[in-house]
Each structure stands twice: as C-alpha cells, then as structure tokens.
Amino acid sequence: MMKIDNILISHLHGDHVFGIFGLLSTLGMLGRTAPLHIYAPRDFSSILHFWQGHFGEGVAYEIVHHLLSAKAPEVICETRTVDVLAFPLNHGIDTFGFLFREKWPLDRAGNPMRLGRSAAYCSDTAPFPEESEWLKGVDLIYHEATYGEEMHDKAIARYHSTAARAATVAREAGAKQLVLGHFSSRYKDLTPLLEEARAIFPETVLAQESGRYVIPIPERL
C-alpha cells in the first residue's frame, strides 16, 4: 500500500470515489511522507479540501490533485516502464478512461527491444464514435457492461453500455482480450451477459474480485 504513488479516478459518482478517503486516512496512520498524486476530474479538488479540513488531521503527506481535462487520448503520467493516457468517456458528467502503454528499454540503435503491452480501462460510458479508434490495437480492455442488450434503451438513457456494446468496441479496436465489469445488481446470474459478449468477441471473461489477467510478453523485435 505504501508503494502507491499515483491514483486514477475516472469520475465522481460515489461508487467510484468514496473508498479513496479511507485509503488516504490509512496511509496517514501508517506514517506516509511521500507525496501522493491523484488524477481526477475538476470537482475532486473541492471534495478533497472538504475532507482535509474535516477529517484530514494527522495526514502529514502532500496530496497533489492533477486535473483531468483531456479531449482525446493524452499522456497524464509517466513512469520508467509505463505511460498512462486519459481520454474522455460519455457518462453525462466529466468521466475519463485510461490507457496504459508499457515501455521497454532501447537497444543500441535507439529502438525498443520489444513491443510494449497495453491495457485500457473504460469505466461508466455510453457508446460514442471515437472509442474504438482510440483503443486500436490494445491488448486488453476492461469495459463496463452494466446491462444486457435487452435493456439497451435504459443503458443509453443512463449513459451506460451493454455487454454487446463492450464486445463490439473490443472487436472494432482489434483487442486481444476483453474483461467485463460493473454489472447491474439486477443480474444474479451473469452467464447471459458473458454469452452475449462472446457471440461478438469470443475472448471475453467476467471481471473477478482480485482477479489477475495475463498479457503475454511479446517476442523480441
């Protein structure tokens, strides 16, 4: 937990942001001193300041809010091994997806030794034209699938996706794997959602709590 340096928040609906404040408090109690960078939509700043003023006593480390405002995929964070890009989603409020691109060391000619792997996180979103294009060639996509296609109209009205729509994005993007998540609680059995997606994009699985999804290391160039 203490190794966390960067946190990404897609949007400010409660199911995507409330949990962070317990984490911030825990890091403070554990004696964190290193700055923590949080990438989030504009209004997170006022929420953070409220929390710091009322509940942040004893939190000695710096919390840096980086405003997300991308209109198309753009790099927001770089580490030695990964570039993180943000891009806008379609959810009725400021909402962002994230694209992770692996970086490999360069050879003597200045070229990457391997092709970097990639993964995309698409949280709450209704369909929009640019999504598949922005994710072209990605290895793995996590995509929300709140509803089945039988509830297509409700999905659109609430700025969400169906399992079929998520699978269509993966197919059009040329992805290798699709992980579905963010299911409506109305579904006690998720098998129909999985089957709906696999009819369009066979390499689909359902997200699991603490699940791990392997992206194979590519051959050397």
Predicted regions and their residues:
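Active-site metal-binding motif and surrounding structural segment of the metallo-beta-lactamase
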Residues: 1-39, 67-69
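Metal-dependent phosphodiesterase/nuclease catalytic metal-binding core
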Residues: 69-181, 189-200, 216-221
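Binuclear metal-dependent phosphoesterase catalytic core
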Residues: 207-219
